[in-house]
Amino acid sequence: MFRKLLATVAAVAACALLLFWLWPSDVMEQEGQSKESAITLLAQTDDGDDVTMRVEQGEWEETVSKTQEQGESRVVTDSHVDFQAGAAGQGAGKKGQEMASVVLMTTPRGKDCHLTLSDGTRVWLNADSKLEFPEQFRGARRTVRLSGEAYFEVAKDSRHPFVVETEYLTTTVLGTSFNVRAYTVSDASVTLVEGRVQVASPSVRKPVVLKPGQRLDVVGSRFSMNTVNTYAYTQRKEGFFYFPDDTMRQIMVELGRWYNKAVVFEDASHMNLRLHFVAERTQSLAEIVNSLSEMDGVNIELGSNEIVVK
């Protein structure tokens, strides 16, 4: 049984949204391929297999990006990490101590992490991602920094906006559920699931207000508005791969990241093949490949370090 968006995105009401980049190096010619047309998506990495957490003493600076290079990391084995416990009396907006612990959560490919922040906000951190946040929120804003992908269910607090910063994006909300995807900056989009958001970008002459079910795609200096099925954007935290009408390229990038495999297309034209495909994230890669291979026009082989689409 199946179990279950330099740019600024400001929420002007309760909303749910998705922001999306693709790695600049996602598509590159593979060295040593016998076929000239062979293309590799998402090379395999060797970054370890454990979810880790690093906690450091230091001042949390809302406007300066911090790089965590010191302090010891520890492996996280809990299915849910709760920072809300012991947070009484130290919520957002209370200065309290000037020094606050800074936490960096890191997930490898193939593993995700569910955590609850000190304000009660729930976060599902996807694989191959990093989330930096203060152990206790203080000041006018509740700010976190993300590299990768995470789904947020934000605790409502109209006096202290919740802010998700990425390298080229800032998303501000007052209390809602949304997904932020920021693995890279070559492609960007915002998808609104519910509520109302205003999107500002150097690519857009004036801010654009989205309606539920709309996605704003930004590629370089161009942008476009599309109507999409928003159901797919909430299913990851429920334990699914859900591709309602996605290209083989999009599907393979997701699978390669989750299972930490290089993805090779022997014929680039197959990257544009569209499929409807649903699977549980707990399934083995072999099971996923077998299911995909049963579809018309799909021929996939699984090697020890790569997935080959023929």
Q: Could you tell me what each predicted segment is?
A:
Residues 4-10, 20-310:
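A residue-level detector for the "anchor" residue at the start of short, highly conserved motifs
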